[in-house]
Regions:
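Bacterial N-terminal signal peptides that target proteins for export
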Residues: 2-13
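Bacterial N-terminal signal peptides
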Residues: 11-21
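Sec/Tat signal peptide C-region and signal peptidase I cleavage site
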Residues: 21-27
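Electrostatic cytochrome c docking/interface patches
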Residues: 33-70, 126-130
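Flexible coil segments in periplasmic/lumen-exposed cytochrome c-class electron-transfer proteins
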Residues: 43, 130-188
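Gly/Gly-Pro-rich "capping" loops immediately C-terminal to redox-active cysteine motifs
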Residues: 68, 83-126
Length: 188
């Protein structure tokens, strides 16, 4: 009826099927229950994007003179005195253009839009207290960094109207693509 070889093959196939079924049924780990479902209020609080044209900038104001002390208190430990180097990298100064072997990618030589300074600072600085700066403080720090890079004067006020008007030295240094955003993703 069954040969030894056929019987062994059949038993092996049944065992493999049972083992595979056991692994699939009982071996799968449950999905970890991490986080929570984002509420509309959560999403609204995260919607802090600033666009190059200034869309999304909050009300507030600041000057480089106001930002200097704040920089010394909040930023110099990582970015050095006056933003010229440190473990967090230089934000100002630099003598090597972007086409050199070791280019300086500081704000004045690399960043194409002044509004990006505000956006990045508000989201990601200071590193030990993200999101802790008020809009006025971020405007003051932005003004100070622009001043340190020779782009504005010490008393020039940065706000939602003046900041997008700053023409950064490397504004035309990137290859741009036209992107059409779906209506649902355009800022309100």
């Amino acid at each position: 009826m069954f040969t030894n070889k056929l019987l062994r093959t059949l038993v092996g196939f049944v065992m493999l099927t049972l083992l595979t079924s056991a692994v699939v049924a009982g071996g799968a780990r449950p999905t970890p229950q991490l986080g929570k479902v984002a509420t509309p209020e959560d999403v609204a609080a995260w919607n802090i994007s600033i666009f190059p044209d200034g869309t999304g900038l909050p009300s507030g104001r600041g000057t480089a003179a106001e930002g200097k002390l704040l920089f010394a208190q909040q930023c110099a430990s990582c970015h050095g005195d006056e933003g010229i180097g440190g473990p967090g990298g230089e934000l100002a100064g630099g003598n090597y253009p972007l086409n050199s072997e070791s280019p300086d990618k500081n704000i004045g030589q690399y960043w194409p839009f002044a509004t990006t300074i505000f956006d990045f600072t508000r989201r990601a600085m200071p590193m030990n207290a993200l999101g802790s700066l008020s809009a006025n403080q971020v405007y003051a720090l932005t003004a100070y960094l622009l001043f340190r890079n020779g782009i504005i004067g010490a008393e020039d006020e940065m706000n939602a109207v003046s900041l997008p008007k700053i023409n950064m030295p490397n504004r035309d240094g990137f290859i741009w693509i036209d992107v059409v955003l779906p209506k649902s993703s355009k800022p309100k």
